[in-house]
Amino acid sequence: VIFAEEVPEKHSLEIFSALKSKKSFIVGPSSIGLLIPKVLKLGAIGGTEGRQLVQSKLLEPGDVAVFSSSGGMTNEIIRTVIGQGRRLSFALSFGGERFPIFSPTEAFLAAEDDPKTKTIVYFGELGGTDEYELADLISKKKIKKEVICYIAGIVADMFESPPQFGHAKALAKTDVETAVAKKKVLKDAGAKVADSFSEFVEMIGNSNGKVVEDNEEYSIIQQDMTDRKKALIASSISGDIDGEPQILGENLLSFAKDHSFAYISASLFLGRKIQSQRLEKCVDFILRQLVDHGPYVSGAVN
């Protein structure tokens, strides 16, 4: 799995060409990872903390395959599948680059060949033409298993010129690359295509396969840390008093509740509480200008 972002397209194509003659594959670039429950976990897919791994039921193999270009949405859909009483057969994120080395077509064919997989859950977005290849596979019965899809980016049709979403590929330069066109071609091919994210969740809940009762509990083994030495770093910004986290001499929760985000950001940056309201307003103005107000994010569901 290649986790790195901004890998030159030339390098990706070279890797793709080199792998053609070998019985191996690479997921990425810009991928969050590859996951096969109870067998393999590469990357942050499914979570990084013990609590997240337990909640994602990674020790319980199932029959639902999850695919998406978006790393964040891959994890979100994994949790959605689990929340609907289903379990994963495997999951992966292609990465948001224009030329992922392991394509959605290859992933769908792998799921079709996997005897454990009964349902394929796919989160796509505007840009590119991968969905047309997927629709062709479905219509030609090369993919016979249940396919549930959501295609993000319909909001792009509201703009006079096509907006660039967060991923390099997420730009509909032509009509065939729009989310509306992709939804239609997949639906016409026989896939189940949701018109809203809530409908997408409902489709997953009603999908084929086994529903698992959430009864089994797993204990997370905590490593014995009694041999750890105290840190030799003294901080005047953060600390704790009787187990309560402190920021600049004030309780963390109270500090976050009583002050604006601009005040907190400026104070932490300077290492002391700011006194100037003009500075606070200036920082607030800068943050408002920099924040992403529009739909230009990967996997936008609005």
Q: Whereabouts are the PLM-identified features?
A:
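Catalytic-core regions of core metabolic enzymes
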Residues: 1-254, 260, 268, 272-302
